[in-house]
Structures are given as structure tokens and as C-alpha cells.
Amino acid sequence: MNHYYVYIITNWNNKVLYIGVTNNIARRIYEHKNKLIDGFTKKYNVYKLVYLEEMNDVEAAISREKQLK
């Protein structure tokens, strides 16, 4: 069974939030912490996991991500 994760990460002072979806949360958090992906999270140094929700359906995960945004 596949697992998908909706997650929220923030910066050191909790001023900036990023909401995303992934099928590998450990890899994705590692990428954010080590600034391996150019974009919003690298620019704003967003890396601290503050919320995690697991789902079995990718469409449901994407829908939840949009709801949170």
C-alpha cells in the first residue's frame, strides 16, 4: 500500500510556512534541511517539520494540501 504525506514546515522563528505533499517524508525533509531544491524553502530557510498527516490516496493528499493552503 502506498503512503502519502501532507506536511507543513517552517523556518527557525516560525514566521514562514510551507505546505507540501510527498510519498517519502524522510527524503523530503532531508532535501529541505540541506537546501537541495531551489525555490521557496531554500530562499526562506524553511526546514522544521511542524505538522504531518499520512494518507493512502494521492488524490486525497493533494486535496488536503490545497485545503490547508
Which residues does each PLM region occupy?
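GIY-YIG nuclease catalytic motif and its immediate N-terminal context
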Residues: M1-D38, K42-K69
